């Protein structure tokens, strides 16, 4: 009996020691007089190949990423990247009835690897900056890591996870309701919050009841996006991109207009609206009997609905409904995409906003390249990004978009010139101007 008791005590002690040893290491709190370097981890389960807001954050931040980032991040001496494996292909289902099961398994897989990265593969940091969405499993795991490692949590709100999920399942689905509760419940425990628009800040205060510091950080383009004015350089760029090489000279000399639209081919971007507008534009050009400038439309990006829309494009071509309109799709490197925007005539944004308060980064990139934009404007935050008639124009229907294409791309070019000048002026607003006085100061990175 005594032996059993001693063995039990030994087993409990051994298990306790092992458990404590397995806990993530904690950040040692320095005295008020000590000035240790501020460290920040960015927790983001997104592709960093096309750097969104997270890759524009201060170069003193460490990253947890799940994809290959651009070379600028890889080469930076103050950035260390901890990669997460992508979910298995079998969890990428398009079938709605399988989605709940696949989603749960995907979250569990991400949770396992993310916890290993947050708790063991990285050192303890002063701050953990979580990009939201995705909310699951990042919010819960980041809060746990902060508790165990003496770190503090900042949530960087790009949108709401539940509003994006509602696009797939419907707003009344139990999983959407659960996600909404989860985001609201866990977000209240963060130390501070960043968000992309004033409209989003209002929602966070009124509906999420956020009481902690909440700072609006409007997106700004990275240094890769900048206007290119030299015609020889523009010609060289267009000639080097397969999708524009045959039309490069015509584009430079104004005999062809180059439209660029970046899309994720998802339900929150109604690409059929652009196709309808282009058909209307084509019909108008054909019926007028007057010479019309050809349009070369380059669509970049990958996504689940791409094949469906490509079939629609082929059908429209076969029916002769795209007279003088040539549509090509492309998957470009980050650098080529940035240069393509700088050489384009007009950008098109079909982002409709699942929440009404997020802002499309693609428009920010277009402005960074000095490219004016026409975009869907039927959501609250649109005026925070685009100054109507100065940097771009909004539309609410295919008919309106078709009219904008005719007025901006036709005539004597004065309308396009005004928008181009506005976009070039907007391109001077850069990330440091937003980050340094707000986030940089709050984090102690800028004094």
UniProtKB/Swiss-Prot annotation:
Cytoplasmic side: 1-2
Pfam families xref list: Glyco_trans_1_4, Glyco_trans_4_4
Signal peptide: none
GO CC annotation: endoplasmic reticulum membrane
Example GO molecular function: chitobiosyldiphosphodolichol beta-mannosyltransferase activity
Biological process annotations from GO: protein glycosylation
Record pathway: Protein modification; protein glycosylation
CDD domains: GT33_ALG1-like
Regions that span the bilayer: 3-23
Chief location: endoplasmic reticulum
InterPro entries, A to Z: ALG1-like, Glyco_trans_4-like_N
Keyword Membrane appears in the UniProt entry: yes
Primary enzyme class: transferase
Membrane topology value: Single-pass type II membrane protein
Keyword entries, A-Z: Endoplasmic reticulum, Glycosyltransferase, Membrane, Signal-anchor, Transferase, Transmembrane, Transmembrane helix
Subcellular location: Endoplasmic reticulum membrane
Catalysed reactions listed for this entry: an N,N'-diacetylchitobiosyl-diphospho-di-trans,poly-cis-dolichol + GDP-alpha-D-mannose = a beta-D-Man-(1->4)-beta-D-GlcNAc-(1->4)-alpha-D-GlcNAc-diphospho-di-trans,poly-cis-dolichol + GDP + H(+)
Enzyme Commission number(s) from the entry: 2.4.1.142
Protein role: Participates in the formation of the lipid-linked precursor oligosaccharide for N-glycosylation. Involved in assembling the dolichol-pyrophosphate-GlcNAc(2)-Man(5) intermediate on the cytoplasmic surface of the ER.
Protein family: Belongs to the glycosyltransferase group 1 family. Glycosyltransferase 33 subfamily.
Protein name: Chitobiosyldiphosphodolichol beta-mannosyltransferase
